[in-house]
Amino acid sequence: MLTEVRRKKLSYLFDILDANKNGLLQPDDFAAVAEKICNILEFDGSSTERLQLKLKSLRLYVQLLTDMNKEDVSISKPEWLELFGSRTMINPKTAKKYIFRTAAYIFNLFDQNGDRIISKEEYLDMFRIYNIDLEYSEIGFQKIDENSDGQITLSEMIAAFRDFLMSSNPEAAGNWIFGNWDTSQAA
């Protein structure tokens, strides 16, 4: 069962991931994110880098469908919430692996130069690509950057995702990973 805090955070994340705002998560939503990243990185329209990034962006989505035993390629918001609220789909034992996989996906997608850290600029790009209000990017970065060294490591990203996906504490630092989930609306 989801607490109200978790329901709000997960609904907010669903709205962010729903790039075309049709109320469903679909492969096109994830491909659109890849296209935006490719444009920022100025990858040629037919480059292997562009294709690799598109494949990377779809990997997590395919895994979501697999985890949900879905034959249909669309995920509705109620299905999304059920995924995270059901102890049969994501139980405490599998949550750790799931959080790592999700955090690593986002981390690798936005570590644009491959230096194994997320810089402030790369973090800002994540906000731009997902149309998240930039007003909250600085506080989000500061809260996730646990050691205040001006960069986000994979372990810091994992901790943030653990907070965001699993914590019912509205003050958890990782809740800010995608901006202010409590008052902001995904664009």
Please provide the spans of the model-predicted regions.
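Boundary/linker elements of alpha-helical solenoid repeat scaffolds
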Residues: 41-48, 82-92, 119-122
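EF-hand and EF-hand-like Ca2+-sensor regions
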Residues: 60-112, 125-139, 143-187
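Glycine-aliphatic tripeptides that mark coil-to-beta-strand junctions in extracellular
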Residues: 23-27, 75, 116-118, 150-152
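Eukaryote-specific detector of the first structured module of a protein
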Residues: 1-62, 67-70
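N-terminal alpha-helical segment
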Residues: 6, 10, 103, 119, ...
